[in-house]
Amino acid sequence: MATSASSHLNKGIKQMYMSLPQGEKVQAMYIWVDGTGEGLRCKTRTLDCEPKCVEELPEWNFDGSSTFQSESSNSDMYLSPVAMFRDPFRKEPNKLVFCEVFKYNQKPAETNLRHTCKRIMDMVSNQHPWFGMEQEYTLLGTDGHPFGWPSDGFPGPQGLYYCGVGADKAYRRDIMEAHYRACLYAGVKITGTYAEVKHAQWEFQIGPCEGIRMGDHLWVARFILHRVCKDFGVIATFDSKPIPGNWNGAGCHTNFSTKTMREENGLKHIKEAIEKLSKRHRYHIRAYDPKGGLDNARRLTGFHKTSNINDFSAGVADRSASIRIPRTVGQEKKGYFEARCPSANCDPFAVTEAIVRTCLLNETGDQPFQYKN
């Protein structure tokens, strides 16, 4: 089982320095989505005092030609802070700062999907859209092999590992526990976690978050996971089908509700939203992974608890459907529905924006509507 060389270094030496006092100064780590639409980058600056809100944080810049976001001849890109969290690695008063990215002309970068999403969420704020996203991931060794899998074969068949207990059923629970606690410390709205169906696969849930905050919290939770995995010397992949063959893929099931859906007889509004989604399936498939559906084509096969990528379906307690209505929601006739098609490597801003456009703004067709300022 290959782990990184840095994970074998003496961590006690680092702690000797991390315990030094830092006076009134604060380290703020700025985090952003790079030009791939999947990767995260970060850099740290020193502030003279602890910021009390995100508005007190200064804008910054970076070399976009090194992150697939600009040409080297015009490489300066701008970081605009939009969300602030406690830093679980350096601890208080230090901060994690999630940022939007803007070009030299102050237009949003191509992978800054938050900018448009924020505008769409503001348009429906009176409906109080809530989201919860279930982030699946697979642990790999530094050689790209699933962590804990035999080097020359496969583990036992699926069925033993979901919510599994024991060294032969749940690999690297310590990573999950460290990530969970780090998210709680940071103020990320993490609500649960468990071992998934495939060996070395885990899931954590973020939410419920209202509107734009869903994407902020999920991206920062992903960042924290990558940092935790680095300390343990392994890799977390959000690939939608990291292991070909008879193994589960990885999704990011997205739960959605509005105020009216959560109220008495809200099931009526849930069914109306599902009907709208059924007429716009191709648009949503394109929005549900960063490659416009190509990643999900490997995952949404109609097998391994997925629907077929080409067909829309919905049902109560049906995990092979595009949309699942939880049984308790069907019984209570109010609550939420689960969109099961988003891939594990989706951009949460793209997913939540698409759902709102179709379900609340009543858009139709294969392209998003362009609203005037």
Swiss-Prot record:
Q: Which residues carry this modification: N6-acetyllysine?
A: K11, K14
**Modified positions (N-acetylalanine) in chain numbering:** A2
Q: Which residues take part in binding Mn(2+) 1?
A: E134, H253, E338
Occurrences of domain GS catalytic (ranges): 113-373
Q: What does the record give as EC number?
A: 6.3.1.2, 2.3.1.225
Please state what the protein is called.
Glutamine synthetase
Question: Gene for this protein?
Answer: GLUL
The Phosphoserine modification is found at S343
Q: Which residues bind ADP?
A: Y336, F337, E338
Q: Name one GO molecular function term.
A: metal ion binding
Q: Which residues bind L-glutamate?
A: N246, W247, R319, R340
Which amino acids does the record list as binding ATP?
Answer: E134, E203, F204, Q205, I206, G207, P208, N255, F256, S257, R319, R324
User: Can you give the residue ranges of the GS beta-grasp domain?
Assistant: 24-106
Q: How does it assemble?
A: Decamer; composed of two pentamers. Interacts with PALMD. Interacts with RHOJ. Interacts with BEST2; this interaction tethers a fraction of GLUL to the membrane, causing a decrease of cytosolic glutamine synthase (GS) activity and inhibits the chloride channel activity of BEST2 by affecting the gating at the aperture in the absence of intracellular glutamate.
Q: Where in the cell is it found?
A: Cytoplasm, Cytosol; Microsome; Mitochondrion; Cell membrane
Native source organism of the sequence: Cricetulus griseus
The domain of life is Eukaryota
